[in-house]
């Protein structure tokens, strides 16, 4: 997780509503947020709140402008369009998931 200041796991009550291109609203749970010194941005990773724990979930990632509490809100989410930036986000996610798996085994 080089080049990242911190990773903050999402709290149970941290949810964001996203609206798709058809105008449908879907509630997402915040998995975690982190900052990148290389890109000078904050990032949030989300998964659908409707998914059960035993299902494989599709995780969505966005850059965001933190509010006064340092949190993300749906109005301040921006798509990640750069391949190198995506690679960095995937590396952070994979490290987070590997750490989470090792904590479950302890």
From Swiss-Prot:
It holds the Pfam family DUF1292. It comes from the Bacteria. InterPro entries: UPF0473. Belongs to the UPF0473 family. This is UPF0473 protein LCABL_08490. It comes from Lacticaseibacillus casei (strain BL23).
């Amino acid at each position: 997780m080089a080049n990242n200041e911190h990773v903050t796991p999402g709290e149970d009550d941290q949810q964001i509503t996203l609206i798709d291109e058809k105008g449908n609203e879907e509630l997402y749970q915040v998995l975690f947020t982190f900052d990148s010194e290389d890109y000078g941005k904050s990032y949030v990773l989300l998964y659908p709140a409707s998914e059960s724990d035993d299902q494989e979930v599709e995780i969505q990632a966005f850059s965001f402008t933190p509010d006064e509490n340092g949190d993300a809100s749906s109005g301040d989410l921006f798509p990640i369009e750069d391949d190198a930036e995506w690679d960095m986000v995937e590396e952070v996610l994979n490290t987070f998931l590997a750490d989470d798996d090792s904590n479950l085994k302890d």
